[in-house]
Every structure is written in structure tokens, then in C-alpha cells.
Amino acid sequence: MNTSNNQSIIILASRDELSYLLINHLAQHFTISQVIFEAPHTRKMLRYRLKKLGAWIVAGQLAFLVVDRLLIRRQSRPMIDRLLSGHDASPPDGRLPILEVDSVNGAEVTAMLAEQKPQVVVVTGTGIIAKRILALAPTFINIHVGITPRYRGVHGGFWAVYEGRPDLAGTTIHRVDPGVDTGAIIAQVPITVESNDTYRTLPVKQYLAALDAMSTAVQSALDGKLTTYERTDLESRQWYSPTLPEYLNFVRRLK
């Protein structure tokens, strides 16, 4: 698969290992015109959570983050390394054109999209994209680590296990609209949940499972043959980061 001269592809991404994995995979199949990395907004996200969820829930989430940083991250690394063996999850700097921005909704991104007029914009790990940005390209495609519409938001695989629905652990490739993972579904790919999985290994499995589906979606969009569908069999719900008690319940579900 490859792009012709008038079929520009831009990637909007966060700086993390899984975004690198997707970017490098797509770069093997397509000519990537530009990669735009959005800076993290930790303080802004914390303020949003406090307003949306309340101090008690946020305190539980922060307690979980401490456990994640001190324990889960380290324990998960060997399995993640095995999963990523044979794949390139290194930063694409020096190999692809890179632009660092504070926000995907800022002036630099607006100017870049207006200038390059991409046929497809791939999204991985950024914040919500404004309507005015979405109007600058015909197709925005997102990779989401959850089966929508049931697991919108973050950590969809985690929440599927938490609810006792490992059959709904998987990845959704979908068109981007102004909502939170509410765009029309292009493809959904399930994963196999194992008893030794963790909060951190599930997203790795979800990205790996959907790499080919994303490539197919991008090619279909370039060819003008992209098709979508909706799932009316699943209730729609947005999920947030887990609290420590919720993580402990997740661990019990895995056993």
C-alpha cells in the first residue's frame, strides 16, 4: 500500500510507546506527510476530573496512579517487551517530519492542515479535537482501546475485564466526531485476555491487534471506499481512570 502525490496523510499523536508503534507501522505502508505530537495536559486534566468526578473519586484515582508507578509499570515491562518483540515502538524522530504543539486545536495545527490539505488524518492518544479542526480534512480516523459504544473514554480493555466482559476487550477503529469516541465504527478487533495481563499489557495487545485494521482503514479512505457501521446492541458509556479499589476488583476478575 502506498499514497500517490495528492494523497497526504497526517498523524496527530501523543508521545508514548503505543503511538510510536502505530506511527512506525503506518510509515511502512504509506508516505506520512507530517506527524504532530500534542503535549500532555496533566494539570488541565486534573482540574477537569475534579469538576466532573469530585475530589473523592480523584483521590482514589491518584492512589491508583501511585501503585501503577511503583508496582504495575515495573511488573508489566517484561510482558510488554515480549509482546512488542519484532515491532518498532521507537520514536520516529529523524525519520519522519515532526511538529511539536501544545494543542491539536491550536493555530499551528490549523495552519498545517490548511496548507497540506490531507486526505486522511490518523489520531492516536490526543485530546478532543474541535469541530473547526475536523472541518479541515475529509477523514479523521482514531484508534481507541475499547469496544464502542460500551467502552468510550479511557482504558476500555481494563473496564471490560472489570465488568466481567473479557469478550468485549478489544480495539475500535472509528471516524472522529466532536464527541468522546462516538464516531462511526470502521472496524473492531477483539483481544484475548489472560490471567497474567495487567492494566498496562492490555493496551499493548489492543494496539497490536488493530495495526492491520488501521492500515486497511487508511487505504480505504484514500480509495474513497471507507465504510462504517453502528452497534445498537451495546449501551453507550464513557469511562475514566480507575480508582485503587476498582483496580483491585479488576485483579480479582483476572483470576
Feature map (PLM): residue ranges:
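One-carbon transfer enzymes
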Residues: 1-255
